[in-house]
Amino acid sequence: MLKVLNLGLSGKARIWTDEGFSFPGDFPPVFYPVVNERIEIIDENAKISSFFTREVMIEILAPLGARFLYGCLGAIFEPNDSGKLVLKVAVSTEVEREVKSSLASSLDIVRVGIPEEYANSVFEGSKLKLQEPGVSKIIGSGEISFKWGTFGELGSSRAFFRDLSYTVIEVMVRDKVRANDNINPLFKKVLEQSL
């Protein structure tokens, strides 16, 4: 399901849940060649998951006066019986194919991928959410893989990708876990409108 959100003052967001992740009018999904993969075990004693496979991708364009923030991230949770909750981030190069139908295409050169520059931030933000009390226990045993994304050459930043990855996990678990009220106001607005 694709949901389009108006964030006010020309800010926009799109949220995809449990479906193919491609931008309208752009046939190839936002997959990219993986040049490296960051992997970390978040919980070594995870119980069997009550979650089914879940997929979430969020794209946000947020104008801020004369500048703007842009990013898109997608992740999948795949339950298994390994007894571990594993977090993975698939890293791309910085010169992947250009996307012409992103929310920021008229403002920025947008490319598919999660380059090394943002991979650590994706890890930080998602770990922050997963380490909140009870979250990893509720998710249970399985793998969360960030393997879809786009970034802008001008509008993307490490801090934005950290908050975006946190928000992707928040959307993934929100029907089972109480939302954190200490989230960045822009992302809180996305969460409130996405229900």
Label the predicted regions:
Residues 1-195:
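Accessory interaction regions appended to the cores of large information-processing enzymes
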